[in-house]
C-alpha cells in the first residue's frame, strides 16, 4: 500500500523546506510513499527544492496559475499514484512516524470508506502567545480535538486538510475539492465524502506540528473569511443552514456594531494585553475579549457575504413560496407566470411543508420543514430583497408594489400586504432578514404567520403595512 502526500503551497518556500525535511526522516521507506507539492503559482520557485530533497524523497512538483488551495490540491490529485491520499500543508512539520501510522490504519481497515484524522498541535519550538494557546483550547477556534476521544469516530467537520487521509479511489468516485471555495474547502469536501459513507477515525498519536506564528489580527481576518465561507457552504448545502451560525453571526455582528465596537478596535485591545502578565481573574476577561472579537469577525464575514453580489446577474427580488403537491406538475398558468416573472427580474423557491420536496423547473424545492426551507432559500437567494408570499398570490402587480415600497422606504425595514384570505405577503432586504434573526417561530397562520416587526422596531426601523388589496380573479394555483 503506497501513500500520496499532497502539499499545497503558495509563497512559503522556507516552510516547505522544513516540511520536506521532516518527510525525508519518516520511518516509512522511500518507496512506500510519494510527495506531490501542489504549487499554486508561487513567486519564490518552490520547485528549486527538488535538488535538495529529490534523492531522499519520491518528490514531484506540479504547478498551476495562482487560484486557490482547492484548485492546487485537485491539480496534484490528478497525478497521484498512491492507494491512499494524505493531505497536509506546507507549514506543517510531520513527526517521524506520521506516515507509518496513516499507512497502518488503512492496512487494518481496507474498506474504501475508511478515513483517518491525525492530530495537529503547535510546533514545539514556536514561541506561543496567550492568544495562540487560546485558539487551540476548549474554544476550538483553530482545532477542536479536545472534544474527540482517541480511536473514536469523528464527524465530517473534523476533516482537517492538515492531517487527514482517505482512499484515493473513494475520493475519485465521490468528489474532489470544490474550487469555488477559497476557505473551508477541506471541511466542505469532508461533508460530501461523509454523505457518500466516509467513516473518519481519530488517531491522537499521529501528530503533525503546525509551524506558523499566528497574530491576533491575522486570525481575526481569517475568521471573517470563515464567515464568508459559511454562507457559501449553506448555499451549496441548504440542508445544513440550520446547523451553521449564519443567522446568529449576522445578528451578533449588527448588535456589536450598534454598541459602538469595531473589529479594528477589538484587535487593538487584544494586541495591547497580549504581552501583559495578568492575574487569573484578568485572564478570564481576556478570554471574553478574544471570544467577542472572533465571534464578531465571523459574523462580519457572514454579513459581507450576504451583502455581496452573486456571480451572474442577480435577481432583484427572490420570492419564497409554499406550494401545493410537489409530486405533480405545476399547472400551466402558474408555470407560465413564473417564467414570465423570472424574465422580469424575479427568482422563485417553492417548497411544501410536511413532506419531502423534489426539484422543479424553473424553481427549486427546499424540503419538508417550513422554517428550514425559508432559511435555506434566503441563503441561496440572489435577490436584493426577499419576498414571502403564497402561490395563489403570485401576481406581478402585487410583487411590484412590495418591491417598490421596500426600495422606496428603506427606513421601514419591511413592508407587508394583508391579503383577503388573512395571509400576509411581505418584503424585506435580504441582509436585514439575517440581521434580525429571520423567522424565529411560527404563529397564527400555519404557513406565513411570523412577525418580524417587533425585532425590526427594536433596531430602529418602522415596518409598514400596505393598504389591503383583493387578490386578482383567476387563481394561479392551478
Where do the language-model regions lie?
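Glycine-rich, basic loop-to-helix element that forms the pyrophosphate-binding segment
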Residues: 64-80, 364-380
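Short aromatic/hydrophobic "clamp" motif used to bind/position activated sugar donors
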Residues: 85, 386
